[in-house]
Amino acid sequence: MTEKNIFPKEPMKPIEKPVHPGGNNISNEPLHKNSLWFTHDPAIYHDPVSGKYYVYGTGADGLCSDDMVTWERIGKITDVPPKDAFDHVGTNHIWAPDIVKVGEEYRLYCSNSSFGVQQSCIYLAVSDKAQGPFIPRGVVVKTDANCHLNAIDANIIEDVDNGKQYMVYGSFWGGIHILELDKQTGLAAEEGFGKCIARRPRWCDGAIEGPYIIYNPDTQYYYLFCSYGSLSCDYNIRVARSKSVLGPYLDHNNRDMTDLDDTDNTIGYMVACGYAFHEGTEYMAPGHNSVLHDFDGEWYIVHHVREKNFKKAGPSTMHVRKMYWSKDGWPLVSPEIYAGEKLVSLTENDVVGHYERIRLTPTIPQGIQVSTAMELRADHTACFGILTQVTWEMTGDNTMVLRYSNIEEEYQVAPAWDYELWKPTLVITGKDNKGICLWGKKL
């Protein structure tokens, strides 16, 4: 490993999953103040006033951080849904909040629903502080069993050309819709449910939810992130992009996210799925992500994830990861949890060595992708699996390409913290010329 001081410092070790001494049942003991367990549907926000980072999650639980590496629980950020929401839904559940600041007002968009039904609504709560408390203002949209969609999982996006504000939302059934908001009130600016911009076929139960749209000023595209599959086992994160906030959103193969002809589960550019490095925790169902384009221009993706257990889904936890961009404008997600690392100039000598690599291949159902060994040699040859006729080269200070047969893999190379082996490392994150994402780390 390189001798240069390029690596992040050792982070605080993650708090262990709380369990009863006997084994399987989750403890009812209060969570450690730095625990990320039970964080679900995390929405990331960097407050320009306090300078602190916040995460808002299902259950109205809040987290706060100075650096996105160490987090502290701050308790409930809002109390109960408004009466008109409760009267419609019949529960006080608060799911999947998302936040936006308009003027001096912080606006939290919360979902009120019960699992597996369409009797749902999204309501707005407001505060003069990022940490709340948020006070309900009113219902934005609601659905019931007679509707073709489900009103949960809100995210707010602004049109960079005209300043109009939109709410993208939806879960299963009729897919993901986008609805214009009244920027003055934060409530709906139009009747109805808006426009469908993504959906899934009936064979997979229409399993799409957790939409999140961000705009990249460098590529001048809006990017729609959403989760496919089941939150309890095979969640995976897909991406499509559009020049217009209203779509159409097309994937890496120019397929529309509303296209129902997807028998092989390949529509949508997959940036994360269940994975396992050797000697590390096997993770499944990364999903319901949010994205942060920070004040310094850096990009991050935040999502919940579970430890592998296909028999009984355990509690979720939260991962924050650096996000980079390919040369043709697609997001690339770090294979390791964020520890404060920055991109630095690297040499070929830094990069030479033994690696584990993971190919994030779409499958039905979406399984856990397991790492395989790879070696990058000083003579610019490489090998992995049964492939020996492989070459590689650095194409920039922190970019690399790997070639074999008719395949070309493009990578970002960056320092990181190896959370499996608990040591500094280099990671590679990239995609091949077929649009399949790849992860790797140096041993």
What are these regions (language model features)?
Residues 1-443:
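Carbohydrate-active catalytic/glycan-binding domains of CAZyme proteins
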